[in-house]
UniProtKB/Swiss-Prot annotation:
Keywords: Cell membrane, Cobalt, Cobalt transport, Ion transport, Membrane, Nickel, Nickel transport, Transmembrane, Transmembrane helix, Transport. Coiled coil: none annotated. This is Putative nickel/cobalt efflux system MJ1092. The chain crosses the membrane at residues 2-22, 46-66, 79-99, 116-136, 149-169, 188-208. It is a multi-pass membrane protein. GO terms for cellular component: plasma membrane.
């Protein structure tokens, strides 16, 4: 019976991870804006989905570990907000980099892979409240290992879903060119860079506004 329940929890964590990538939020927007606005290919799409997931999972694990050893002296919510601000700043930097590359295409060669890794790490710095809640609940009940396992399974589901979306965006490029036209498509880097900057600003402003309202 216990094994059946654990299996159900694992399946639920996996499904929730997949669904999390489809929930309203900046994850999909960042992936779409970057891939459609740069020369990212299938390898870049897979790398982006994987990097976001690794960064996402590492941050949750870090917050969980910090909550164990520094529970009395550390406010996990404050660390969460700090991660959001740092992630937002990096997103803004990536957005500026995309726009700069568009405006000055001959000044330097665009390193797509470097941009993918930077973007993936920054987007993953904003922890998922649901996954963090599962880990903290497991810690409070003395089941740290179970919590880490469920978060890892959640992250696998997230990785599959995010990577699938990224690949879909790559494959849709040619379709967009066909129906929109190359002239308009050439403006995509300017649009995508602006969107990523706005998302970065929102990521920074969100925790600040929450504290201001409270």
């Amino acid at each position: 019976m216990v094994m059946i329940m654990e299996l159900l929890y694992a399946i639920t964590a996996f499904i929730l991870g997949m669904l999390h990538a489809l929930e309203p939020g900046h994850g999909k927007s960042v992936v779409a804006a970057y891939i459609l606005g740069t020369k990212a290919d299938l390898k870049d799409a897979i790398l982006l989905g994987t990097t976001i997931t690794i960064s996402h999972t590492a941050v949750i694990f870090l917050l969980g570990i910090l909550s164990i050893y520094l529970l009395e002296s550390l406010n996990v919510d404050v660390v969460h907000d700090m991660m959001s601000v740092v992630g937002g700043l990096i997103l803004i930097a990536v957005g500026i980099w995309i726009i700069r590359s568009y405006l000055h295409p001959h000044e330097h060669k665009v390193d797509t892979k470097k941009g993918v890794i930077t973007l993936g790490l920054s987007a993953g710095l904003v922890p998922c409240p649901a996954a963090l809640a599962v880990l903290l609940l497991s810690i409070s009940s003395g089941n740290l290992i179970d919590g880490l396992i469920y978060v890892a399974i959640f992250s696998i589901g997230l990785a599959i879903s995010l990577t699938g979306l990224a690949v879909a965006f790559v494959e849709s490029k040619e379709l967009i060119k066909k129906y929109v036209g190359n002239r308009k498509v050439s403006k995509l880097p300017l649009i995508s860079g602006s969107i990523i900057i706005l998302i970065g600003l929102y990521t920074i402003a969100h925790p600040i506004l929450e504290h201001a309202i409270v």
